[in-house]
């Protein structure tokens, strides 16, 4: 009876989704469970111009929340308990059964525990790094393609991201593709998505990955699955968001160090094109406090926007290591360009559209990418993350080969402090 009355009232007042562990008092009286992904700490990286990634005709719930209240960088909300869904939150409040998932929880400061990876060492030593993204194939046969790529690029990159179900399309897991990368003496960056994991499963799989030899991990909320109806439904809420994943792994660092002799290097995603920019920056600070040690951005197509975002990100932290790696798209086919334009959270600048309208666009597209890369280098980027969208192998290799020399030239022109 109490639940039915509460449901009736709160649905009318707050569009309540009956999670049973109400956080309205912490979210400016806006129900965060109206996020289709069910995020307790948002927004996700797919937000552009304040709109929802899943339902773009709607405003992003978390953008509304974060503009109405100050984000506490050193706390987070844990994933809600499923057993409390569709129960009376007032009863749960009195009983205390929702305490951990209702109240903001403090993050754990494990920043004194050094990560075990070579990528971490290079970044904290302020070496310029080049990382490359290789999508995991759908089947094991596709690993032959990964092998061919690694034979070409192994001596040109510091690490290789291997994806898991990129864009929500089923594929081999990142850890499987990464075995090919590791065999060539290159450190992989393993991806885990909150869309796919409850916390116990995440920690179990991450520990298994460390035992294989992996040290770098990118923890992402994840994209909406293409075959799932778009709407707000308890059944499609994601088990975890990226902040919760980072917090969970960060809380285990001391145990990993003492028991395994390994400390993972935790990374996250960021989006310089989410607006208002202050929310994007504050959320990245939140992830940093929770334990993220590095960040790879969404594809950068407008260096000026990146510069403004990065300056805001670095404000007051000028003496700290530079740990943000902007992603540079190499676009070599019209079909792949269309894919880029449809990716959640990716802003495609008019300058790239003009290049892709040319009859013979591959060389101009490569020169455009060189210009973007040099611009972000001049503004203090820790490195570049290369994403291929249909560019021929020889042009990818040219880009990777020239990155370090171009970085030296870009930094020599820069007014940015490198000390």
Language model segments and positions:
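Active-site pocket-lining/capping segments in soluble small-molecule metabolic enzymes
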Residues: 108-113, 222, 236-259, 269-274, ...
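Hydrophobic faces of well-ordered beta-strands that scaffold small-molecule active sites
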Residues: 130-136, 158-162, 188-192, 217-219, ...
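Short, acidic/polar
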Residues: 139-152, 174, 200-206, 276-286, ...
